[in-house]
Amino acid sequence: MNKDNALQGSSTRPSQGHVGYVHSIETFGSVDGPGIRYIIFLQGCPMRCLFCHNPDTWKQNKVKSMTADELLDQAERYRTYWGEKGGITISGGEALLQIDFLIELFEKAHARQINTCLDTSAQPFTRIGLWFTKFERLMKVTDTVLLDIKHIRDEEHRKLTKFTNHNILDCARYLSEIQKPVWIRHVLIPGITDNDEYLHELAAFLNTLHNIERIDILPYHTLGTYKYDELHLDYPLKGVEPPTQERIDNANKIMESALK
């Protein structure tokens, strides 16, 4: 993974439209949307997922701020690698916390004929008021959504993330209603999301949607646990091991039914 050394931050830049608060940039991503992607990770996330491997993205600090044009100018340096399907992906943290910036960024990206992809857990989603109007506008310039569903059962979702999943599943339904291309992402965690009854329940929900292009089962891992030590935080899933390849294959097989 290449990190963009040109990432610049400024808290004193004169106002030039919205600015995004950026955690990091990956210049050559191959799994975060169609083709080769330039991935911008935004800072800030309300969820506290027990398995989170990027706790350093939680606080929405403003250390690294960049304008849409600055990010797009940097991204276009890598355009020759994108091919026909590649482009930019905005991830987090939770990117929708910065929805005004996202709208400006994606509208300017489309003006430059850059493919756009939003990677989100949809925690801020609501169909009420001004926020929904903004989301509708954002979807007009979003080519693909990577929707991360943490848990299909609300009670367990609250234990896992501290938030309900009602609005998240409603976001999935809305994206189906407008036929927005969606890739589903789901972390396979032994003892939490790795049992057949649960996986069939998830597949049954996904089967009610009509816009799913791909389902990615992401095996739980412990690669980010060192960050908890650096931040003087306790890691909630200490002792939980990654799933076996057999269980990963089993989950993928069950999810195949949701794509038929």
Which residue stretches match the model-derived regions?
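N-terminal [4Fe-4S]-dependent radical SAM core
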Residues: M1-F41, M47-K62, R77-E84
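Auxiliary Fe-S-binding modules of radical SAM enzymes
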Residues: M1-V31, L188-K260
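N-terminal/domain-start segments enriched in small and hydrophobic, helix-friendly residues
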Residues: V22, I39, Q43-P46, T57-K59, ...
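Short glycine-enriched, charge-decorated loop/helix-capping segments at active-site entrances
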Residues: D56-Q60, R158-T164, H232-V240
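Short cysteine/histidine-rich metal-coordination sites, predominantly Zn2+-binding motifs
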Residues: V63-D73
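Short, conserved loop/turn and helix-capping segments at secondary-structure boundaries
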Residues: S65, K162-N165, P242-Q245
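Conserved AdoMet/S-adenosylmethionine-binding subsite of the radical SAM
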Residues: E76-T80, E84-G87, G92, L96-L218, ...
